[in-house]
């Protein structure tokens, strides 16, 4: 697994597998327990397909009581648990472990309530992101966060990763659009955080859960904000001779006080791949392409379009195409949202990175990526949530060529180090998972990481939920002064602790 270190499987748990499977069948009867090798292969990886592992067993509960009972059983018996939504994580956040129960939430797929007067929907975590919008669009509403995988990704996974999308610049990430959740702790306890009402007292545990990557609990119900569709939405497609000019245009648009509904950028390799795949009319004679969407009352949109076009011209734009219909606006976005599968047509494999930088540093980072591309001898196609500086470099490689996966991972790590160096962060919306786990010390010092681990320990003292993710290895509750001695034996007795 290209040098990736994961927790050692618990031999005692592996030996008890048959009994564990039988016990879980008593909790989740029928077809809710999957334990054959062939059937479990469906779950051996998520969107980060470079790393694969079969779970101990797969459990697919249908009720909150079943989730609670499974987690309580695992807690009482010292069995690790890996929660899984739709399996679209690009950071390996739901990669299974050989000694862990994979808890799949796909059967929690119902929309429980739509409350138009309060502009909220109550949904189960297995509902797809796009499914929420589909359920309310006939009344003129929609759910704002829209990651490229919205047709497949689940709202539960969106909460775990704090997903964004092309419209998060104006309408926020998942954290800004989730009002409440029901969750189950590893001990089996069920609690509610937030809801339809204003909830400002006490600690912001709802905010803590959003983006916690399955380390603190399992979400079983989510209350989300739904918005009315804007009166008008139009998109401007602007081409530039260089990525640096496009990046400066982005900074100038925001600097002018304009907050577009969405603002995305692609470089030449991504433009060509998307156009060959979707055929929406992207210009192929430019080095960088901006898609800027303005929404609101028609008179305001017209004014903002003029302002954006003027800023683009000042930055040397060579192409400017304004959508003339809703179909054309959607077509502009279709190419951008298809960028990932489009790149998959021109390369056997690719890694999708997810760093975030200050907007003003975009030209510097793009220049650095070109140098890294030459250093590693690997191509890179770039797509960005340009408005908030969230980069998605796609590193193209061939896993069949010895050493290319490792080179791609090293290339990606250097990109993320560059992001941190210029004042950015390791992830914007894909999460840390296993992909960025060992880069956490690039951004956080020992005290930072220890305090984060203390929060983890408050929810999960035995470190059973999604182990091996987010935190660098050998960072456990025991190192923070909390030790768990089981049957008179200290776990990992050979590990220096003091």
Regions found by a protein language model. Give the residues of each.
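Noncatalytic alpha-helical scaffold of FAD-dependent oxidoreductases
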Residues: 1-498
């Amino acid at each position: 697994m290209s040098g990736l270190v994961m927790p050692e499987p618990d031999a005692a748990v592996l030996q008890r597998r048959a009994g564990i499977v039988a016990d879980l069948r008593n909790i989740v009867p029928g077809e809710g327990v999957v334990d054959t090798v062939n059937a479990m292969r469906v779950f051996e990886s998520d969107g980060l397909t470079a790393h694969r592992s079969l779970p101990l067993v797969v459990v697919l509960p249908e009720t909150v009581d079943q989730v609670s009972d499974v987690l309580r059983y695992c807690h009482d018996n010292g069995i690790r648990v890996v929660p899984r939504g739709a399996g679209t994580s690009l950071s390996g956040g739901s990669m299974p472990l050989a000694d862990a129960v994979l808890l799949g939430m796909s059967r929690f797929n119902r929309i429980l309530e739509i409350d138009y007067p309060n502009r909220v929907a109550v949904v189960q975590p297995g509902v797809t992101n796009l499914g929420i919008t589909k359920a309310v669009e006939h009344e003129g509403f929609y759910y704002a966060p829209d990651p490229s995988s919205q047709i497949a990704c689940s709202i539960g996974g969106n909460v775990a990763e704090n997903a964004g999308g092309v419209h998060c610049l104006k309408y926020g990430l998942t954290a800004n659009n989730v009002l409440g959740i029901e969750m189950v702790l590893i001990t089996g306890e069920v609690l509610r955080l937030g809801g339809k009402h204003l909830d400002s007292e006490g600690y912001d545990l709802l905010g803590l859960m959003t983006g916690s990557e399955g380390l603190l609990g399992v979400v079983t119900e989510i209350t989300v904000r739904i918005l009315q569709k804007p009166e008008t939405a139009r998109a401007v497609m602007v081409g530039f001779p260089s990525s640096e000019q496009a990046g400066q245009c982005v900074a100038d648009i925001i600097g002018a006080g304009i907050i577009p509904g969405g603002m995305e950028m692609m470089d030449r390799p991504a433009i060509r791949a998307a156009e060959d795949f979707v055929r929406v009319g992207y210009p192929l004679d430019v080095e960088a392409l901006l898609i800027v969407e303005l929404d609101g009352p028609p008179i305001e949109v017209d004014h903002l379009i003029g302002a954006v076009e003027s800023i683009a011209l000042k930055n040397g734009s060579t192409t400017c195409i304004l959508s003339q219909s809703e179909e054309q606006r959607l077509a502009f976005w279709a190419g951008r949202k298809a960028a990932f599968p489009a790149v998959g047509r021109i390369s056997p494999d690719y890694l999708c990175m997810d760093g975030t930088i200050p907007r003003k540093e975009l030209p510097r980072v793009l220049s650095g990526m070109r140098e890294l591309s030459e250093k590693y001898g690997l191509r890179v196609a770039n797509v960005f949530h340009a408005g908030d500086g969230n980069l998605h470099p796609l590193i193209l490689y061939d896993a069949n060529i010895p050493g290319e996966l490792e080179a791609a991972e090293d290339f990606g790590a250097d990109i993320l180090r560059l992001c941190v160096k210029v004042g950015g962060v390791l992830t914007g919306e894909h999460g840390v998972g296993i992909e960025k786990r060992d880069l956490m010390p690039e951004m956080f010092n020992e005290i930072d990481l220890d305090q984060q681990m203390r929060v983890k320990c408050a929810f999960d003292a035995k470190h059973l939920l999604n182990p091996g993710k987010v935190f660098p290895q050998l960072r456990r509750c025991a190192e923070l002064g909390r030790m768990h001695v089981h049957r008179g034996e200290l776990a990992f007795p050979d590990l220096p602790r003091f």
